[in-house]
Amino acid sequence: MIKVASITKVEDGSIVTPKGFSAIGTAIGLKKGKKDLGAIVCDVPASCAAVYTTNQIQAAPLQVTKDSITTEGKLQAIIVNSGNANACTGMKGLQDAYEMRALGAEHFGLKEKYVAVASTGVIGVPLPMDIIRKGIVTLIPAKEENGAHSFSEAILTTDLITKETCYEMIIDGKKVMIAGVAKGSGMIHPNMATMLSFITTDARIEHDVLQTALSQITNHTFNQITVDGDTSTNDMVIAMASGLSETKPIDMEHADWETFVFALQKVCEDLAKKIAQDGEGATKLIEVNVLGVQTNEEAKKIAKQIVGSSLVKTAIHGEDPNWGRIISSIGQSEVAINPNTIDITLQSISVLKNSEPQTFSEEEMKERLQEDEIVINVYLHLGKETGSAWGCDLSYEYVKINACYRT
């Protein structure tokens, strides 16, 4: 049983709150007038885990990071640039990514295999290595919160807000910290995709155990968000565990294993929601919960089908309670359902009961649809499993942003 009372959100926490971590973000000239290069550094080689995009076209930095992590399952630094994806840049792009790793290792005095690299931005443009070379040597990570916040700014592209979260958990009666930072706004339809996320913790946990937990939780969080249905070439989630907390090693047999997993899930869920809420041109976060299904996978599939529907997204943007678009999406999900037993609530107002339309106050509904967060609940009465997905509305601004992205 998960000890929820053993987990507390730390409102002013960041990726440098867990013991052993420091961070920095700075402007080196990849983006005009904005921070565009950052680093997270650990005092010791940290156990690590990662989940990557499933796009068959994988960017050079992602390939280099895979190479680093598979060597020992440890990392000590992550270097990230924004403004340039270093994707579809051929062999030269791969060489540049390896050089970026080598430059970081030299600057921080680390083994190359302990350094990961990540890039995000425009695809198909060579990475300006003269700028990268001059920039990396200026990185001086700080253990203070301003270092973490500057890093969160340096990894942004079309994002409007930074995305950070932090939790404290009790393991073996002692405080253990876990935190995360992310970027992502457009081209979001992960399996894993369209976003970068970096998680730090001082938990004592080995690479393979952390990988199991991260892979499992990613399927319930990051893989359940969608903004525009496009899957990126670059993006990934990396978790680093310094092991500097004074607890016994955490594994699946540990009495507090579920506490750790729940805390990791909360970090990933917080970041996933922030990404969905910050979707390009978004004005509303949409949460879809599907209940009463035979399997969790089926529930998640239906939820993602609904939240990814352009017609549902535009209806929410227009504050139109058009539940017909919701039930149509349910039918398109390819999950076997009973079309006669569907209940739907929109902002806790019943709009469909046993697949029959319900009378509701248009005035009350309009008022609730003006809120920033919209919740759609679907009850299928087929089983006991549930699943959720997150997305955002689709606005005129989304088209403007993406029509002019390169300019």
Swiss-Prot record:
The record marks T120, G121 as: Involved in the stabilization of negative charge on the oxyanion by the formation of the oxyanion hole. The active site is at T194 (nucleophile). Its EC number is 2.3.1.35, 2.3.1.1. One of its GO terms (cellular component) is cytoplasm. It catalyses: N(2)-acetyl-L-ornithine + L-glutamate = N-acetyl-L-glutamate + L-ornithine; L-glutamate + acetyl-CoA = N-acetyl-L-glutamate + CoA + H(+). It comes from the Bacteria. GO terms for molecular function: glutamate N-acetyltransferase activity; L-glutamate N-acetyltransferase activity. Pathway: Amino-acid biosynthesis; L-arginine biosynthesis; L-ornithine and N-acetyl-L-glutamate from L-glutamate and N(2)-acetyl-L-ornithine (cyclic): step 1/1; Amino-acid biosynthesis; L-arginine biosynthesis; N(2)-acetyl-L-ornithine from L-glutamate: step 1/4. CDD domains: OAT. Its main location: cytoplasm. The record marks A193, T194 as: Cleavage. It is found in: Cytoplasm. GO terms for biological process: L-arginine biosynthetic process; ornithine biosynthetic process. Substrate binds at T157, K183, T194, E280, N402, T407. Pfam families: ArgJ (PF01960). Keywords: Acyltransferase, Amino-acid biosynthesis, Arginine biosynthesis, Autocatalytic cleavage, Cytoplasm, Multifunctional enzyme, Transferase. Belongs to the ArgJ family. Heterotetramer of two alpha and two beta chains. Catalyzes two activities which are involved in the cyclic version of arginine biosynthesis: the synthesis of N-acetylglutamate from glutamate and acetyl-CoA as the acetyl donor, and of ornithine by transacetylation between N(2)-acetylornithine and glutamate. This is Arginine biosynthesis bifunctional protein ArgJ.
